[in-house]
From Swiss-Prot:
It comes from the Eukaryota. This is Glutathione S-transferase U5. Glutathione binds at S15, P16, N41, K42, K55, V56, E68, S69. Induction: By auxin.
Amino acid sequence: MAEKEEVKLLGIWASPFSRRVEMALKLKGIPYEYVEEILENKSPLLLALNPIHKKVPVLVHNGKTILESHVILEYIDETWPQNPILPQDPYERSKARFFAKLVDEQIMNVGFISMARADEKGREVLAEQVRELIMYLEKELVGKDYFGGKTVGFLDFVAGSLIPFCLERGWEGIGLEVITEEKFPEFKRWVRNLEKVEIVKDCVPPREEHVEHMNYMAERVRSS
């Protein structure tokens, strides 16, 4: 009989970065222990496992610590090969990694960090910059159910956890509509497809609480 594996995930309920890791673990069918962290009072365990960044997510697998959501997703895919989340083709895999960085670096910074600090006029300028970036994702989705084709995978988890199930809730809290059906029909169709996937639905934070949390996070950014 195979020895039981230790798989533990430290996360925060509203964090898109830990939610995407949960999506991957659920897709792979990997049993895991989830440890909820508190943003303002991080546990000694988290600080010991991630002393450099002191952030979630942290994955612990048989005593080994894996940090940063993109790295964790790739580790999960390589460790448990069933239901692959990264494309098998090297070129498609490179594109998925590129667009994942676009989401987490550029769209996140413009659509949340900069927007939280901007006044109303500045937000409109930043919203247009976000639209220009999301248009690249819109083009990638033409003719596809998901970024990888017919099944959810790496880029769906990264972009889905951050944009429709996080940033859009922040924009909702300040009364700003950034992504419209008219301008982004493929993106909106993709979101509807994601909302039907059981493992995704299981990991999406409750809307009202999340909108409140995003308002709180924006306040933290403004006061930092």
